[in-house]
Amino acid sequence: MAKILVHVTNGPENPTRAALAFLVAKSAIDEGHSVSMFLAGDAVQLMRKAVLDNLAGLGTGELRAHFDAIVSGGGRFYLSGMSSKGRGVSEEDLRSIPAEFAMPEVLVRLSLEHDRMFTY
């Protein structure tokens, strides 16, 4: 199966697009693909528990349900270190999440290692 990278820059200010990115990632896992997600800009805030537990998109579902399915399916999360620092997202926010902070060169490397890339 394919390796899919989903690059997300929309955060809580655009819940429908944010949830859509996670729905697409979940759908790829459901189809048997390997998925990585790179969150940058406002999207890094999606990893906060309060946001995960409460965000729902119009017609794109609940963020928590999609997130849990991605984690269960072996998905990996990368958060822009600079975006996270600027928005106060810390190691504590990522404590129980399969995620790591990453710099732009990691996004470039991931884009080359994956077969397809979706951007939201």
Feature-to-residue mapping (PLM):
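Short internal beta-strands
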Residues: A25, V35-A40, F77-G81
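C-terminal structural segments of small proteins and small subunits
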Residues: G86-T119
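N-terminal beta-loop-helix "entrance" segment that forms/cooperates
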Residues: A43-G57
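Anion (oxyanion) recognition and catalysis
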Residues: I29, V71, S111-L112
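A glycine-rich helix N-cap at a beta->alpha junction
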Residues: N54-G81
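Short, glycine-rich nucleotide/cofactor-binding loops
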Residues: L5-A19, V51
